[in-house]
Amino acid sequence: MVFNVRESTRGTRREFPHEVEVTDHVWIPMSDGTRLSAKLWIPKGATVHPVPAILEYLPYRKNEFTALRDSIRHPYFAGHGYASVRVDMRGCGDSEGILTDEYAKQEQDDALEVLDWIGKQDWATGSVGMIGKSWGGFNGLQVAALQHPALKAIITLCSTDDRYADDVHYKGGALLASDMLWWASTMLVYNARPADPAHVGGAWRENWLERLEKTPPFVEEWMRHQRRDGYWKHGSVCEDYSAIKIPVYAVGGWADGYTNAVFRMIQNLKGPKKGLIGPWAHEYPEVAVPGPQIGFLQECLRWWDQWLKEEETGIMDEPVLRVWLQDAVPPKTDYHVRPGEWVLENSWPSPNVQEKAYYLASQQLSEEPGQGTETLMTHQHHGLYAGVFCPFGQEGDMPSDQGIENGLSNTFTSEPLVEELAILGFPKMQAKLLSSSKRANLAVRLSDLSPSGTSKLISWGQLNLTHRNSHEFPEDVPVGEEFIVTVELDAIGYKLPKGHRVQVSLSPVYWPHMWPTAEEVELTVVKDKDTRLILPDYTNTTEEAEIVPFERPETAAVMEREVLRESGRTREIRHNTVTNEWILDDFSDEGCRRLPANGLEYGSTNQNIYRITEGDPLSASVQCDWTLTVGRGEWQTRLESTSTMKADERKFYVSSQLRALEGDVVVYDTTRNFEVERDFN
């Protein structure tokens, strides 16, 4: 469940230093007349003895959709002497207006006005921190860069400093087919849900119809910007790290798709900073899987006490970066726990990381340069066993054994390691290539081959080769001429034991993570000194006595909920041996729940189907179907959407259908079709 609170080893805290008063709905007026809806958790007596505030600012509906996860965190902060403020962004939940896109200027301007509003409340000291995961982690960084005087510190989880390089739209300059349409279809149907009549009154239906009519499918704008132009630079704080002057605590997980930015921010931010990377998926570390979970809320309090209450907690005396260095494990599609150890670094890049190079030889990785050339295999269904780009910790999220994938790509394997090899940082693949076409892609997988023969994916990367020199100014791939590229793989912390082997695999195809080129390409690798795998070889110098242990995970009590339908997930790969079509069918039923506190019922199902036919890259297609329900008693609404994406030699074609029902009556049913030229993609 993306927005459920999973069972975990955490403790539940029911008594706090402060009693908490809760206001479910309060309006925050914007200067243009639009009102945003907020929920408040305020320590009792704060109007006499004001307290600092913690803001979470999201498009995900506080009344029901994030209510469970909000219930374990915001009361916890409030119980420790903070006003906790949860705001539905413009056009979402009970808030008025329209959400037109991710991370738009309007979103950031509204956040500044929310900070103004908090500062004027009689319970507020005027010091505010922002916390958020994913979208809330993104906008925390973006608002920090705007330097509002009330914002004193942020905690950003599962986010990025570079919207083009590390998000669900493009990766390595190639369209991220597995996620771009899925996320656009997700936000299309999420945004289509109505405000709660209990809070907004009889205007809910008029507001709902306006929201349905005016909220665009975000994918259209994303597809208009296939290169790293000004659209993506907006909201990418890497454009000017110096704009962020307040303290930043950046948190990521190895199982997540948003970990790379932690290293970049620790390297480039000039102000106070800390980085934390655990084994976790796209979730808060006190409940995330794979474990071990940590007392993250206590860690947050140390941060907030340091910067919002100006109390010395010792948190800044500890090393700037703390990382869970993972042990080798057999490949599985889900893990409850990833064994490993915490390591500490005082800076990044670290002097404890040195480059270790392997060269490509005949199906081997060698310490000496190879000879000759090798044409890469082209199998359009290579990549089906890669797992998902952004795991939330559901069953089926993680990559399968890579044995099948290795047979569909050119795989090079080292001799058995004579001693343990720890890697921490960004692996890189430098390759000298020859191409038969002006358009070509390259996917690189790094795996751990165990003595038993299992192959576990450690990291991966992909590159649209027209972007080899610049994501902003792509250029044709030279045909029939040698050229050199470097593919940076995702950052990783992993220990390969003695006796294991390093594997690297190359392919011009990686479906569905990488949308295929319009025609099959013959890509040849030149096996000489310029073609090599470069690993960040890590020496652990951390002394156990240096490590300040995290406290046991604990939260406030999760609010009461009734399960009306259980959740479930299936992820299947099918092959039609007559047509040679391959289908990846990913279905998630997030169940249906009722919240007795407000009577709201909500549920959803999502099915994503990725199709491709061997030998025909133009057969690639994606279809994403959603059904969402939200209601109370006789008031029931239902949203249904179907989004599709396909391409020919010249264009991408996208269709977005949205259907809304009140009870059994269809009140809205519209399909939008969109096409755009392929821009070096």
Regions found by a protein language model. Give the residues of each.
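Accessory cap/linker subdomain of secreted extracellular hydrolases
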Residues: D70-S71, G79, A145-A243
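C-terminal, loop-rich substrate-recognition/catalytic regions characterized by aromatic stacking residues
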Residues: R10, E286, P290-L661, V665-N681
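Alpha/beta-hydrolase fold nucleophile elbow
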Residues: W123-S134
